[in-house]
From Swiss-Prot:
Family: Belongs to the universal ribosomal protein uS19 family.
NCBIfam families registered for this protein in UniProt: rpsS_bact
GO CC annotations on file: cytoplasm; small ribosomal subunit
Keywords in alphabetical order: Ribonucleoprotein, Ribosomal protein, RNA-binding, rRNA-binding
Recorded GO MF terms: rRNA binding; structural constituent of ribosome
Protein name, UniProt field: Small ribosomal subunit protein uS19
Record-level GO BP terms: ribosomal small subunit assembly; translation
Function per UniProt: Protein S19 forms a complex with S13 that binds strongly to the 16S ribosomal RNA.
Annotated Pfam families: Ribosomal_S19
Length: 93
């Protein structure tokens, strides 16, 4: 279920404040964020945001294609190592 249109997109207030301050000063620093639910706004394009994945901060460089998506979509929380090739099960069949 998507968010109600009358509420508008969610973004952490501190993150938005930091982005606006950096845009005024023309700075491009890495911003550490724990708010994976924040929506990516057009003001964030060109910035690198370090999104927390539960263990560490994963650097995410924001491009135009990412606008409207959530920050958490680009920092995976689970490591997929693939399925094991178990030779015993394949020989039985």
């Amino acid at each position: 279920m998507s968010r109600s249109a009358k509420k508008g997109p969610f973004i952490h207030k501190g993150l938005l404040r930091k982005i606006e301050e950096m845009n005024e000063k023309d700075e491009k620093k890495v911003i550490k964020v724990w708010s994976r639910a924040s929506t990516i706004f057009p003001q964030m394009i060109g910035h690198t945001i370090a999104v927390h994945d539960g263990r560490k901060h994963v650097p995410v460089y924001v491009t135009e294609d990412m606008v409207g998506h959530k920050l958490g979509e680009f920092a995976l929380t689970r490591t997929y190592r693939g399925h094991d090739d178990d030779e015993k099960t394949s020989k039985r069949k």
